[in-house]
């Protein structure tokens, strides 16, 4: 009888200790006992008033569409925004802000993604004819490591990967986002696609054939006001020949140094003819992949290398077409240059 009374009393005392929460000891006891023995889970406040404003930043607007409800990706974007804020007091010598523990909370919250990403600098303005053809799959970059990675990932993983990559580079001087307003590079890049252009590689090497480059309007277009171009206009095209090459178009095919080029990224055979043209030193020859709907070197001649501002390396929009834009099949046939 005494043992039963003692056990009952001890149980009563334990319950009082748990329920009273007097002093720090009460909190400590509860934090240790409840999770282990009662499997109690705290509910975070899901009130919209407590959602951080960083959840609705420019990166989230840029990357995610209206339909996604993923708490994982939403929390990731929130953390990235919170760590790339404008509070100079949190920046260290490497330019990376300190991590905030409170930014983990959005991982447990749900919200609607914001529609209509902000407008980014357009490339290939003006002279290229826009043609709303039926959608076809891009034949470029299919063997890239980005494509291999994303092919086995879920939609959440794709969105998260895109968010991390673009948010890191978005404010960097090493890269710049660009928007495609025409179909001159179709089927590789379609109207409405958005790419990340890196600005580093050409400090260490020359532009190469098959590179997709973003460049300022060539000088010849600025000399004639009737073209309607200014120094602020930029284009996006693919390099098909480099300095010292001879370029020619005949029978719907491109010839470089009198060797026909087998290009699997071109939409269709060319409907125009072009006499042999020499590419001088310090220049490259650029064409759009949609050869018959592109305003390029076959119209205005070789492009000065100094006008190139970057190389397209990554398409981050739309999310369903996230991929690199680097051409991986380097089996483009090039013949010797004739010297006389």
Swiss-Prot record:
Topological category with respect to the lipid bilayer: Single-pass membrane protein
Entry's transmembrane regions: 155-175
Entry GO terms, CC: chloroplast thylakoid; chloroplast thylakoid membrane
Keyword entries, A-Z: Chloroplast, Hydrolase, Membrane, Plastid, Protease, Thylakoid, Transit peptide, Transmembrane, Transmembrane helix
Active-site residues per Swiss-Prot or TrEMBL entry: 184
InterPro entries hit by this protein: LexA/Signal_pep-like_sf, Pept_S26A_signal_pept_1, Pept_S26A_signal_pept_1_CS, Pept_S26A_signal_pept_1_Ser-AS, Peptidase_S26
Molecular functions (GO terms): endopeptidase activity; serine-type endopeptidase activity
Transit peptide range per the UniProt entry: 1-52
Any Pfam family the entry gives: Peptidase_S26
SS bond list: none
Chain ranges on the Lumenal, thylakoid side, renumbered to this chain: 176-340
Subcellular location: Plastid, Chloroplast thylakoid membrane
Reactions listed under catalytic activity: Cleavage of hydrophobic, N-terminal signal or leader sequences from secreted and periplasmic proteins
Domain of life: Eukaryota
Record function comment: Cleaves the thylakoid-transfer domain from a chloroplast protein.
Family recorded in the similarity comment: Belongs to the peptidase S26 family.
Protein name (record): Thylakoidal processing peptidase 1, chloroplastic
Native source organism of the sequence: Arabidopsis thaliana
Gene behind the chain: TPP1
């Amino acid at each position: 009888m005494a043992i039963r009374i003692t056990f009952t009393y001890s149980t009563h005392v334990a319950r009082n200790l748990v329920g009273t929460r007097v002093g720090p000891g009460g909190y400590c006891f509860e934090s240790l006992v409840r999770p282990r023995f009662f499997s109690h889970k705290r509910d975070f406040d899901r009130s919209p008033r407590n959602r951080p404003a960083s959840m609705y930043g420019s990166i989230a607007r840029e990357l995610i569409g209206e339909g996604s409800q993923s708490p994982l990706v939403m929390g990731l974007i929130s953390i990235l925004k919170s760590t790339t804020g404008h509070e100079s007091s949190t920046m260290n010598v490497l330019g990376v802000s300190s991590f905030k523990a409170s930014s983990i909370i959005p991982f447990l919250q749900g919200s609607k993604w914001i529609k209509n990403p902000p407008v980014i600098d357009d490339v290939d303005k003006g002279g290229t004819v826009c043609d709303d053809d039926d959608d076809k799959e891009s034949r470029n970059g299919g063997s890239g490591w980005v494509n291999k990675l994303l092919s086995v990932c879920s939609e959440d993983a794709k969105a998260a990967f895109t968010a991390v990559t673009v948010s890191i580079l978005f404010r960097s001087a090493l890269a710049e986002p660009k928007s495609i307003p025409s179909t001159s590079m179709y089927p590789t890049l379609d109207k409405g696609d958005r790419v990340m252009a890196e600005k580093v590689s050409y400090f260490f090497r020359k532009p190469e054939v098959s590179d997709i480059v973003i460049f300022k309007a060539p000088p010849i277009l600025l000399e004639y006001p009737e073209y309607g171009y200014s120094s602020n206009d930029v284009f996006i095209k693919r390099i098909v020949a480099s300095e010292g090459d001879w370029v020619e178009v005949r029978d719907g095919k491109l010839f470089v140094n009198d060797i026909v080029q087998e290009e699997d990224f071109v939409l269709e055979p060319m409907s125009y003819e072009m006499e042999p043209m020499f590419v001088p030193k310090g220049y490259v020859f650029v064409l759009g992949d949609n050869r018959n709907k592109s305003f390029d070197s076959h119209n205005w001649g070789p492009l000065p290398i100094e006008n190139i501002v970057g190389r397209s390396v990554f398409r981050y929009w739309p999310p369903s077409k996230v991929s690199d834009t680097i051409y991986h099949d380097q089996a483009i046939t090039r013949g010797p240059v004739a010297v006389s």
